[in-house]
């Protein structure tokens, strides 16, 4: 809720991050909110979402992040180091083929942001990744760890994650690690079945 975000910004000492704004209500509303956040000393977390919906492919994620970055700098008065992008960590392993690339597309978007939107930071909500495996905490924990391992290598700066839902990457059982790597990196279409 926007009013709650504003109240938090007005009444919190120290640095605040507003999670989140997006282009889904159009450019003018996006800029209005961004300027208000900046005026109150906050940084923005920008979701890869616009009037056409949530970005689910690599090209759409790049397009929306580039557009938001340009608007925040040119019209919002932001310096790049006050912009954080969340390019949407979406659920993989659902059995729906369109979802197979969601994790690797997120990682590639993070890498692209680091190369093309200088100074911007990246973030994401990790638990979304493994919703298809609710009730199987061992698999979910391995998925989160493997995903973070690769996303951090790609340039991920921060993540929203439940630390009790993580395993050490180096301690994941080899067969589980192989299966999870195949799901996250979309390197084997049969990985979810294994």
Regions found by a protein language model. Name each.
Residues 111, 117, 121-124, 128-194:
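Active-site loops and adjacent core secondary-structure elements that bind or stabilize anionic groups
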Residues 1-2, 21-24, 47-52, 88-90, ...:
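Active-site beta-loop-alpha junctions enriched in small/polar residues
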């Amino acid at each position: 809720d926007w009013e709650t975000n504003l109240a938090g910004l007005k009444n919190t000492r120290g640095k605040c991050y507003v999670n989140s704004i997006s282009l889904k209500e159009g450019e003018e509303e996006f800029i209005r909110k961004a300027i208000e956040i900046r005026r109150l000393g906050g940084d923005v977390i920008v979701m890869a979402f616009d009037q056409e919906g949530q970005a689910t492919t690599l090209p759409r994620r790049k397009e929306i992040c580039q557009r938001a970055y340009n608007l925040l700098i040119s019209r919002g008065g932001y310096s790049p180091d006050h912009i954080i992008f969340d390019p949407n960590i979406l659920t993989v392993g659902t059995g729906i083929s369109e979802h197979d690339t969601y994790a690797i597309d997120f990682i590639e978007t993070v890498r692209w942001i680091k190369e093309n939107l200088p100074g911007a930071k990246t973030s994401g909500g990790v638990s979304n990744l493994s919703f298809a495996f609710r009730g199987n905490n061992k698999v979910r924990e391995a998925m989160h760890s493997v995903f973070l391992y690769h996303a951090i290598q790609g340039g991920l700066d921060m993540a929203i994650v439940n630390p009790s839902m993580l395993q050490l990457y180096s301690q994941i059982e080899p067969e589980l690690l192989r299966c999870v790597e195949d799901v996250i990196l979309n390197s084997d279409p049969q990985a979810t079945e294994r």
